[in-house]
Amino acid sequence: MTELAQMKCEACQADAPKVTDAELAELIRMIPDWGVEVRDGIMQLERVYKFKNFKLAMEFTNKLADLAEEEFHHPGILTEWGKVTVTWWSHSIKGLHRNDFIMAAKTDQLLD
């Protein structure tokens, strides 16, 4: 279990700080399978998970939904045949918060 995956998300308000460039560089190394995307000027974490069929992709999606509810932090999820695209960002600050990296690490653990 990674250090990030052991952490809990904290409440993120609109005035919470986004991760700094230095924090981003440190945190992204802890989740090497994730990439950083910028959409509409908003930095986001994204990963595509591959599965053998739609049913397995859907099972993963449902596990992720349960995790998101437990942590009160919710991703963008696109479930397709054989793959699930997961995108994490903090809506309230329109960017990346430490919570997003925690949730990315926790998402990876759903495969175990």
Swiss-Prot record:
Q: Name one GO molecular function term.
A: 4-alpha-hydroxytetrahydrobiopterin dehydratase activity
This protein's superkingdom?
Answer: Bacteria
The Enzyme Commission number assigned here is 4.2.1.96
Report keywords, A-Z.
Lyase
Q: What class of enzyme is it?
A: lyase
Give the Pfam families listed for this entry: Pterin_4a
Would the keyword DNA-binding be found if you checked this record's keyword annotation?
Answer: no
UniProt catalytic activity:
(4aS,6R)-4a-hydroxy-L-erythro-5,6,7,8-tetrahydrobiopterin = (6R)-L-erythro-6,7-dihydrobiopterin + H2O
Record keyword Phosphoprotein present: no
GO BP annotations of the record are:
tetrahydrobiopterin biosynthetic process
Annotated family: Belongs to the pterin-4-alpha-carbinolamine dehydratase family.
Name by which UniProt lists this protein = Putative pterin-4-alpha-carbinolamine dehydratase
Lineage, top ranks? Bacteria, Pseudomonadati, Pseudomonadota, Gammaproteobacteria, Alteromonadales
